[in-house]
C-alpha cells in the first residue's frame, strides 16, 4: 500500500480551497446567495452563474447607496452614517428613489421641502412698477 497519509487521495499539487466570491472578485457571499435562491423556491433549478450575477448586483447597489450616504454624512459634518443619511441619499437620487420609492426607512425622516405658496412674497420694487402693471 502506498501513500496512506492525511492527504486522502488528493493529487499532488492541488490548490487550496477558494470561495466563489473570491473567484468572482466580490465581497458579497456567492454561496449564501446560491443557497437562498435554492431554498426560496423561485425555480426548480438554479444555474451556476445566477448567484454570482445577483451577488454582483447587490454589491453594486450597496456600494452606490453607501457612497451617497457617506457624502450626505460628510455634508452634515458627521463621521458616522445614520438612517437619516441613507434616506437623504436615496431620495435625492432619481434612480434610487424610483427603485426604492415605496420603501420606508426607520428613523429616516423626510426631505426638507417648503411649498412655493407658503414662502413670503418678494417686495423689492418701488411704486412705479406697481402703477405700470395696472
From Swiss-Prot:
The record marks 121 as: Not ubiquitinated. Phosphorylated to form H2AS128ph (gamma-H2A) in response to DNA double-strand breaks (DSBs) generated by exogenous genotoxic agents and by stalled replication forks. Phosphorylation is dependent on the DNA damage checkpoint kinases MEC1/ATR and TEL1/ATM, spreads on either side of a detected DSB site and may mark the surrounding chromatin for recruitment of proteins required for DNA damage signaling and repair. Gamma-H2A is removed from the DNA prior to the strand invasion-primer extension step of the repair process and subsequently dephosphorylated. It is found in: Nucleus; Chromosome. Keywords: Acetylation, Chromosome, DNA damage, DNA repair, DNA-binding, Methylation, Nucleosome core, Nucleus, Phosphoprotein. Its main location: nucleus. It holds the Pfam family Histone_H2A_C. One of its GO terms (molecular function) is DNA binding. Residues 1-11 have a biased composition (Gly residues). The modification N6-acetyllysine is found at residues 6, 10. A motif ([ST]-Q motif) lies at residues 131-132. InterPro entries: Histone-fold, Histone_H2A, Histone_H2A/H2B/H3, Histone_H2A_C, Histone_H2A_CS. The modification Phosphoserine is found at residue 131. Residues 1-25 are annotated as: Disordered. GO terms for biological process: DNA repair. The keyword Nucleus applies. Core component of nucleosome which plays a central role in DNA double strand break (DSB) repair. Nucleosomes wrap and compact DNA into chromatin, limiting DNA accessibility to the cellular machineries which require DNA as a template. Histones thereby play a central role in transcription regulation, DNA repair, DNA replication and chromosomal stability. DNA accessibility is regulated via a complex set of post-translational modifications of histones, also called histone code, and nucleosome remodeling. The nucleosome is a histone octamer containing two molecules each of H2A, H2B, H3 and H4 assembled in one H3-H4 heterotetramer and two H2A-H2B heterodimers. The octamer wraps approximately 147 bp of DNA. In contrast to vertebrates and insects, its C-terminus is not monoubiquitinated. The [ST]-Q motif constitutes a recognition sequence for kinases from the PI3/PI4-kinase family. Belongs to the histone H2A family. This is Histone H2A. It comes from Chaetomium globosum (strain ATCC 6205 / CBS 148.51 / DSM 1962 / NBRC 6347 / NRRL 1970). The gene is HTA1.
